[in-house]
Amino acid sequence: MIKVVFMGTPDFSVPVLRRLIEDGYEVVGVVTQPDRPVGRKKVLTPTPVKVEAEKHGIPVLQPLKIREKDEYEKVLALEPDLIVTAAFGQIVPNEILEAPKYGCINVHASLLPELRGGAPIHYAIMEGKEKTGITIMYMVEKLDAGDILTQVEVEIEERETTGSLFDKLSEAGAHLLSKTVPLLIQGKLEPIKQNEEEVTFAYNIKREQEKIDWTKTGEEVYNHIRGLNPWPVAYTTLAGQVVKVWWGEKVPITEPAEAGTIVAIEEDGFVVATSNETGVKITELQPSGKKRMSCSQFLRGTKPEIGTKLGENA
């Protein structure tokens, strides 16, 4: 039986681990990030992958730094024939990459060489792409730069969010892995080098990227809102207060107006001007310190005026 070590951390990784177990591989260990304090009460919480591994009685390693000798030697002691990673969250050292008979492979949520990095799902939507996908490739020490083994495309729908695409890609990754591993073991795959001239990056989202830039086009603002839903959530400011914007709709604007100003107030939301003739009607938001709500609920208690400017005094 093929002995596999799985390395992964978030919800995205769980279907991949589950599929390895279902397909009959001997998962001799799981490597995941350390437990983290979560929520206002800072409750120490295990990763989704750790929770899944413990359901199946699989030993779990949680190195703070996998590159340290005493940590990676614990992985090597498991003597895996194959290592599979999916959103593990640390750069894996060569000592591990070179050890397994069948190598180390990674399930990455983009069509490499596009969108290398930790936030490919967010960026696919924020950049307005109509398709993305899964790549399974050999791992190297350089970020997401290994030779490609298999790929599958996944369509991005007009109203797709990072949350819905995350779920689709997670399942697509598990399915593609199920088809890829037997071919890899049988030596039937021809690795393809990535074209370095076509590389783009999707680095982890920073706080300053979450703010809506109303001077962009309506399409770009709409994609920004979708791409940060349900986490970390786009925001703007209204009357000096931070407001998270959970959802909006593209609407035509007939009269020119300064980007970021409210140009219409309707029953289900208010329309904000952008840099072109497409405005964005905010329909779901979350004022600072309050719960997420529909804009119609918000408008029952707060009455912004037409001409009010959003995005100031953040």
Swiss-Prot record:
- Give the catalytic activity: L-methionyl-tRNA(fMet) + (6R)-10-formyltetrahydrofolate = N-formyl-L-methionyl-tRNA(fMet) + (6S)-5,6,7,8-tetrahydrofolate + H(+)
Gene3D superfamilies linked to this entry: Formyl transferase, C-terminal domain (3.10.25.10), Formyl transferase, N-terminal domain (3.40.50.170)
| Top class in the EC scheme | transferase
Disulfide bonding pattern of the chain: none
Positions contributing to (6S)-5,6,7,8-tetrahydrofolate binding:
110-113
What does the similarity note say? Belongs to the Fmt family.
Describe the task this protein carries out: Attaches a formyl group to the free amino group of methionyl-tRNA(fMet). The formyl group appears to play a dual role in the initiator identity of N-formylmethionyl-tRNA by promoting its recognition by IF2 and preventing the misappropriation of this tRNA by the elongation apparatus.
**Name listed for the protein in its UniProt record:** Methionyl-tRNA formyltransferase
